[in-house]
Amino acid sequence: EESYQGGGTILSFGSLAIQSKIPASFYRPDIEALLKQKAALSVPNAAKPTVLIYHSHTTEGYTLLDAGYYTKSTDLRSDSSTQNMVRVGDELCAYLERCGIGVVHDRTTHDKDYSGAYDHSRKTVAGYLEKYPSIEITIDVHRDDITYDNKTKVKPTAKIKGKKAARMMIIAGCEYNRVKNFPDWEYNLRFDLAVQQQVEKQYPGLMRPILFSERKYNMDMTRNSFLLEVGTDGNTPVSYTHLRAHETRGN
């Protein structure tokens, strides 16, 4: 239960941070400059879906008991929609709807064939974008897995209003090296920083640095796409639902 940064170069501006795994010779994010540029978004309309929530790794789950340890038999995946990523997506969806934002939540299990999960979810996203051209934001909701070489699991935790809450991390990608056909990646990074800034205003310390690396993860499909890691498999359902930390998305 700690703050975890991982590798890469940490770039910061105020309370905002990016953990960049991209060589500075290719691109060095200027957080201040990116924040000055407006995200490519329309005004939210409750009558039409603006946001798509989905899960490439749908069966990712959490530690059910905060016992401080786990065993080889601990099951950190679940087919139950009340214990896997669908539960997180349901709560996020409900709140955004209360904020007057049109949302579609896809509850499809995409990781029955784990190695093909992103290919499966890409087809799902493409279908929704065709059906609902009004969708501008896609959020692939996951939970992270941080395990040290000695098998110790990390559960990044913040203390918000005196209670523990699972920290969240946005993953942003770019067109670099092996990643091709991702021309609008900087729009995503701009949007990601705006989201991180809003969350940090309301719940300081809740967000981990944005992980910026040579990844696509279907984020090339809209200009406002990101992958969101809500806690890790070391966190408990109580820690990610406390304060409904995801509610900051609606604001």
What residue spans do the PLM features occupy?
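Conserved small/polar residues in nucleotide/adenosyl-binding loops
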Residues: T241-G250
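Short, glycine/charged-enriched secondary-structure capping and boundary segments
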Residues: A67-G68, T152-P156, L243
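N-terminal catalytic or cofactor-binding beta/alpha core of small enzyme domains
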Residues: E1-S134, D145-N150
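Active-site-proximal helix/loop segments of hydrolytic enzymes
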Residues: Y118-A126, E130-I137, R143-T236
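Catalytic-loop motifs flanking and including active-site residues across diverse enzymes
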Residues: V88, F191, V195, L243
